[in-house]
Amino acid sequence: MKIRPLHDRVIVKRKEVESKSAGGIVLTGTAAGKSTRGEVLAVGNGRILDNGEIKPLDVKVGDIVIFNDGYGVKSEKIDHEEVLIMSESDILAIVEA
């Protein structure tokens, strides 16, 4: 199944969190926590401005992003994989190599 986000929405696949602490201890279960980094899988056409124009999004497919995992982020299962649907405003940063 393909999914195409609308307007300023972005589809993100969460990256796995590192399962070791800084001291080398292996973390399990909730101790490891959920990562707030992910890869952008799809983007909408852009945000609709007050004057009716569409502003293209700053993020693009393939970007690695850091996001706010809060109230506006929706989790969905697509083809047996969990993806997150969020507004571009929920993305805090783009990770550059």
UniProtKB/Swiss-Prot annotation:
A GO MF label: protein folding chaperone
CDD domains named among the record's database cross-references: cpn10 (cd00320)
PROSITE patterns assigned to the protein according to its UniProt record, in alphabetical order: CHAPERONINS_CPN10
Disulphide bridges: none
GO BP term, pick one: chaperone cofactor-dependent protein refolding
Its biological purpose: Together with the chaperonin GroEL, plays an essential role in assisting protein folding. The GroEL-GroES system forms a nano-cage that allows encapsulation of the non-native substrate proteins and provides a physical environment optimized to promote and accelerate protein folding. GroES binds to the apical surface of the GroEL ring, thereby capping the opening of the GroEL channel.
Protein name according to UniProt: Co-chaperonin GroES
Taxonomic lineage from the root: Bacteria, Pseudomonadati, Pseudomonadota, Gammaproteobacteria, Enterobacterales
Gene that specifies this protein: groES
